[in-house]
Amino acid sequence: MSDIETPDPRAIVLDTVAKLPNLPGVYRYFDAENNLLYVGKARDLKKRVSSYFLKNLASPRTALMVEKIARLETTITRSEAEALLLENNLIKTLQPRYNILFRDDKSYPYLKITGQKFPRMAYYRGAVDKKNQYFGPFPSGWAVKESMQILQKVFLLRTCEDSVFANRTRPCLLHQIHRCSAPCVNYISQEDYALDVDNAAKFLRGRQTEVLEVLQAKMLAYAEELKFEQAALVRNQINALSRVLHQQSMDTGGDADIDIIAVIVQGGRACVNLAMVRGGRHLGDRAYFPTHVDNVLTNAEESVAAEVMKAFLAQHYIDKFIPGTLILNTEIDEPELMLALMQQCGHRINLIFQPQGPRRQWLEMAQKGAEISLARLLSEQGSQQTRTRMLVDALKIDVEDIEAFRVECFDISHTQGEATQASCVVFHHHAMQNGEYRRYNINDITPGDDYAAMRQVLMRRYEKVANGDGVMPDVVLIDGGKGQVEMARQVFVELGLDISLIVGVAKGEGRKVGLETLVFVDGRAPQELGKESGALMLIAQIRDEAHRFAITGMRAKRAKARQTSRLEEIEGIGAKRRQKLLARFGGLRGVVDASVEDLSSVEGISRQLAEDIYKQLH
């Protein structure tokens, strides 16, 4: 009886390639261990995928990856734009080894002007709607707040919460320092306030000259009507706006919305510096540092910088605002990519590679910013990598990829058993990863039982991981001694996880940094690294960050509980009435300051109940 022949994986792959359709779609390469190597998109799947299996590949890195391909998957899409969207979702979710990856950042902030009778100006992150006006996006929260300060100085728009606005009886401090026109107490008519809002919107859209002309005409009209007080107020607006325009060192020469993007590659890393011009004002920049740059599959005629630029355009703009003009320091020839992006945003995008005048200065500044940011990263990275390596060596951990070394640290925080919270912070890629931090509200335990709290958070965190859903870290750091570590061991045994990953950090005498002892549960003896140890300094940094994160969450939870608890103790005050009181008076402090008459004016609050509330709170 003859042996059954094992199919050749390469033959299966080539057979799959031969049967691919000439349609747009996304392809995925896997190695023999089912690890995802690469995700790509194509206008013609058969033509694009076949090009990887030619005998003479231009790039050695591409040839190295192709040798590892043991399986191929494809997904057919209706268009290349749809393929682009799917490709980037897969890259962000699955993080293939040979794709350049830009980590998801927090959403960009906007400046929002609400659509109310007297609109409010506010800092905003999140999805936009059609009920309000949104300006941006801005590269940083600081840029939004600076713009808000300008609008306060020039147009005196309100920033107060609606609950505060609805219940004021006299102007606040902002009116006294000429930062608000006090619409809350009718110091300005709805028509005049609407005009200020309209001028503010024009200013943000880059129509500053038009705003100045409108204000000057308004001032002259008041003067002709002998309304000198109103004319003086408009004159003050004109002076404030003129000062702002004079201070704007970045004169756009009429441009409205532009993004300037500079890519620098050095030392196996890359920096993409994105500068933003919105409404004709240069708002600053933000640096991005993609990973997997050293695995870029470059073709002979394409540079690594061009590949990074293409990856940034695809991953960054696929779900974000795209201005009509992009100024780039690296030339790319990707008509399909730009067509897909234009289909996504619904307008034409103009690419400029050789700008002139002020635009050239912007690009040079963006490029210089990228160079400085990358130099700083490489310097810090050398130090960070050294500390990471020292920690790995001190714990005698066998780590395949030091870049992927991951630590998760847990801490419990409460005040005499009240508002117990657990925190989990993450150290990955040689740095703390704020976006992966998590807080856990701890319930159904005896107040002050830290062991039960630790058990609950570890079970909630790693039960999914044990079932194959999630990432297991290389080290699980527990802020505590033998008791906490033993509780962690019990959880890991129940879940069938490796107990050698658990490391406890027992505080030293006087809780001084450098005197900590590392505690293990797999038979290793306790270890004191010494206060000069770089590994211990890294452990202390991670542990302290977990402690800080837990305390801030606990304090917020405690404050929220205390804000409502005094009202909850009053008979006749249920959830709905409590909510109405807090909304009407802007919080518990406002309820305490309210008179019996004010309290009884709230819907659902009788005179007798108002008197009861007043007595209970005083």
Curated annotation (Swiss-Prot):
It is found in: Cytoplasm. The keyword Mitochondrion does not apply. It holds the Pfam family UvrC_RNaseH. GO terms for biological process: nucleotide-excision repair; SOS response. PROSITE patterns: GIY_YIG, UVR, UVRC. The keyword Cell inner membrane does not apply. Residues 22-100 form the GIY-YIG domain. Keywords: Cytoplasm, DNA damage, DNA excision, DNA repair, Excision nuclease, SOS response. GO terms for molecular function: DNA binding; excinuclease ABC activity. GO terms for cellular component: cytoplasm; excinuclease repair complex. Signal peptide: none annotated. Interacts with UvrB in an incision complex. Belongs to the UvrC family. PANTHER family: UVRABC SYSTEM PROTEIN C (PTHR30562:SF1), UVRC/OXIDOREDUCTASE (PTHR30562). This is UvrABC system protein C. It comes from Herminiimonas arsenicoxydans.
